[in-house]
Amino acid sequence: MSTIPSEIINWTILNEIISMDDDDSDFSKGLIIQFIDQAQTTFAQMQRQLDGEKNLTELDNLGHFLKGSSAALGLQRIAWVCERIQNLGRKMEHFFPNKTELVNTLSDKSIINGINIDEDDEEIKIQVDDKDENSIYLILIAKALNQSRLEFKLARIELSKYYNTNL
């Protein structure tokens, strides 16, 4: 398993998109707003899978989808967590780090000042069958989903600062 990037945003990637703005940030800002809507919808779909069907293939697909769109915008920590969800859905990984370890990798920890990093956590109380070999993967995906929500919140803070508006 690769290590999570220390920067929330890869500005080299995002600046390529921003360069298309031509003195008007509406283009790049519009892409970010679309991503925000897309991410919230995808998080909800993942949660429904964890609460309902518990389909690892669908969770893999959702993780892959969000990994691609977040990576394209340079939102590299979200992309990293979504890749873990994808790999857990494929049973290619068997571990997910705890939240404190991941938060401690941030290059600028001041972004978390005043934020309750556990505020939006869904309880990791998904109903699993102890005899189901997929149970551990579902529990780890639930843990990763909570982390992706935190990374999403941190990315929104950074992007809101850049665009000087609440995104």
Swiss-Prot record:
The entry's keywords: Cytoplasm, Nucleus, Phosphoprotein, Two-component regulatory system
Family: Belongs to the YPD1 family.
Main localization category: cytoplasm
Gene it is expressed from: YPD1
Other observations noted: Present with 6330 molecules/cell in log phase SD medium.
Modification(s) after translation: The phosphorelay mechanism involves the sequential transfer of a phosphate group from 'His-576' (H1) to 'Asp-1144' (D1) of SLN1, then to His-64 (H2) of YPD1 and finally to 'Asp-554' (D2) of SSK1 or 'Asp-427' (D2) of SKN7.
Domain HPt: 24-129
Protein name per Swiss-Prot or TrEMBL: Phosphorelay intermediate protein YPD1
One Pfam family it belongs to: Hpt
UniProt-reported outcome of changing K67A: Reduces binding of the 4-aspartylphosphate of SLN1
Gene Ontology BP term (one): osmosensory signaling via phosphorelay pathway
Gene Ontology terms: cellular component: cytoplasm; nucleus
Stated role: Phosphorelay intermediate protein that is part of the branched SLN1-YPD1-SKN7/SSK1 two-component regulatory system, which controls activity of the HOG1 pathway and gene expression in response to changes in the osmolarity of the extracellular environment. Catalyzes the phosphoryl group transfer from the membrane-bound osmosensing histidine kinase SLN1 to two distinct response regulator proteins, SSK1 in the cytoplasm, and transcription factor SKN7 in the nucleus.
Subcellular location: Cytoplasm; Nucleus
Record-listed Phosphohistidine modification sites: H64
Subunit structure: Interacts with the response regulatory domains of SLN1 and SSK1.
Single GO molecular function: transferase activity, transferring phosphorus-containing groups
Keyword Hydrolase part of the UniProt annotation: no
